[in-house]
Regions:
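Class I SAM-dependent methyltransferase Rossmann-like catalytic core
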Residues: 16-27
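Conserved alpha-helix/loop element of class I SAM-dependent methyltransferases that forms part
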Residues: 28-47, 62
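Class I SAM-dependent methyltransferase SAM/SAH-binding core
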Residues: 48-105, 114, 129
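A short SAM/SAH-binding and catalytic strip from SAM-dependent methyltransferases
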Residues: 113-127, 150
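Conserved catalytic/acceptor-binding region of the Class I
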Residues: 128-129, 135, 139-212
């Protein structure tokens, strides 16, 4: 089902996007890191958890059994489409979806025990402001954990596509590489410390995943879901084919028995309020 994403999400304003395609493009990888994010935020029984940029609700889904029936998990996202998807996936679970800008959260100070943000912070126009909001809504002693993508070469499923597209669309280079904008662990650490967090740690974390085939990898890109595939749809048909073939050539080194297997590195930053 296609829905319209609101402005500010890493999809073009007013563009119809299939949330399930987004899950196939990014979700299959992001969920590999969610257990480490929840552990860094010490999500546990009776906890009040805020999942910022909840997307299709994967982090919230994994947090719910950790907090139990006496806890609560709120999922905030600026995208109506993503909230619709998350609400449908988690209906009846105790999940509370809220339409919200991560840079201006509609919650009282000290409302939560833990705040997590999985692959959302790098798309904030002002990520430092967002981290400041995370600190504001956390109680004293509460925990934050954010996960962002490392450098393009350490996230080849996204990095190669962004690099190839940037040669065809040089005017969009900044947009294409926005996914990697918080790749510097020192910058992420400084941001957390600057927001008032203590015991800050930023750890490089790697997971390996796979696609059944190159076609399995490529199919969500054709839907234009996410900041990088959106740009792909701007190209003429001949250029799209050229991009596809070059990306396929680059990723061939990850192919084994027809499947694409590759590692992705992300940074997990955490701290105590």
């Amino acid at each position: 089902m296609s829905t319209t994403f609101g402005a500010g999400f890493h999809a073009a304003p007013g563009k119809a996007v299939d949330a399930s395609a987004y899950d196939r493009w990014t979700g299959r990888w992001s969920r590999l890191f969610i257990p480490a994010v929840l552990a860094a935020a010490t999500v546990g029984p009776r906890g009040r958890v805020l999942d910022v940029s909840t997307g299709t609700g994967e982090a919230a889904r994994m947090a719910l059994p950790l907090v139990g029936t006496d806890g609560v998990v709120v999922g905030a996202d600026i995208s109506p489409a993503m909230l619709t998807s998350a609400r449908a996936e988690l209906f009846g679970s105790g999940f509370l979806p809220v339409a919200a800008d991560g840079q201006a959260l509609p919650f009282r100070d000290a409302s939560f025990d833990a705040v997590v943000c999985q692959l959302g912070l790098q798309f904030f126009p002002d990520p430092a402001r967002g981290v400041g909001e995370f600190r504001r809504v956390l109680r004293e002693g509460g925990r934050v954990a954010v996960c962002v993508i490392s450098t393009p070469d350490r996230a080849p499923m996204w990095g190669n596509l962004a690099d190839v597209l940037s040669r065809f669309l040089p005017e969009l280079r900044d947009v294409l590489f926005l996914s990697f904008s918080l790749h510097d662990p020192n910058r992420l650490e400084d941001m957390l410390v600057g927001a008032g967090f203590h015991d800050v740690r930023v750890e490089r974390t790697t997971r390996e995943g796979s696609f059944e085939s190159f076609a399995d990898y490529w199919e969500p890109i054709e839907t234009g879901v996410g900041s990088i595939p959106q740009s792909f749809l701007r190209l003429a048909a001949a250029d799209r084919q050229a991009v596809r073939e070059e990306v396929r050539s680059r990723l061939s080194r990850f192919e084994l028995n027809g499947k694409l297997r590759m590692s992705v590195e992300m940074l997990i930053g955490s701290g105590r309020a």
